[in-house]
Amino acid sequence: MIFRSELKFLSIVVLFLSFFELSHAQDFQGKAIYQTKTTMDLGDWGGREMSEQQRKQIMERMKSFLEKTFILNFNKTESIYKEDEKLAAPGSGGGWGGFASSFTGGPQYKNVKNQELLQEQEFFGKRFLIKDELKKLDWKMTSETKQIGQYMCFKAIAIKEVDEFDWRSMRRRNTDEQKKNEKEVDTTNTKTVVEDIEIPKTIEIVAWYTPQIPVNQGPGEYWGLPGLILEVNADKTTILCTKIVLNPAEREEIIVPSKGQEITQEEYNKTIKQKMEEMREMYGGRNRGR
């Protein structure tokens, strides 16, 4: 018991010294590489009737959207998070891949000092610049720890409201009422796949952060913890840091995004909703004309 207590004390001392040294660095900067992966059950999208070979082919085509590599460049107050251009795959042809490629996310800038968020976003060929306030999650910090690479990480949990157009949490409606209605075939039904989609209102976020890197930054929209966030588990998506370089010899300037029509997140969501309504009317009209 004494040995364990001494080890715990030494760990705290090491973390404190690391925090003190880095937090007093004048031009502290870092670079983190993150791998993201989103799982998708094709059974939720009519995949139960597909052969195993068909499922494999579709998942291979979807891989460029479900698995990505991102780079986070950060300092004490700012960060820029963007997809690794060397590994970014071109959008695929039709189907879900073609639809998903219509939502192209650009660099995301966070300024924790000014509570500012900026992100370049392209939607059906039109470029937008989303400008909004940073949304901070109500993190519940725990004493649970684990090692990620050479860093001791602590667990934090939060409940997050899901954006109504976050495709990573989309799933097909599968209520008991719907199952009951499936027995009654309606030949006049023109409901589209989009109308069959639902998104949960909230999801649980589990984050692992390290006080050894004392910046309250993290991948994507995640931030606000007393240390860099190295791992995030959000519903069907996992984000994991695979490499960190602190104070690199060749520093990369954090450039604030500036391209596109300036718009708030709420206004951007309204634009998407309007476009999807147009698509529903267009495809619904085709179905009724058959």
PLM segments and residue spans:
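Extended soluble regions of mature proteins
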Residues: 27-290
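Bacterial Sec-dependent N-terminal signal peptides
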Residues: 1-34, 288-289
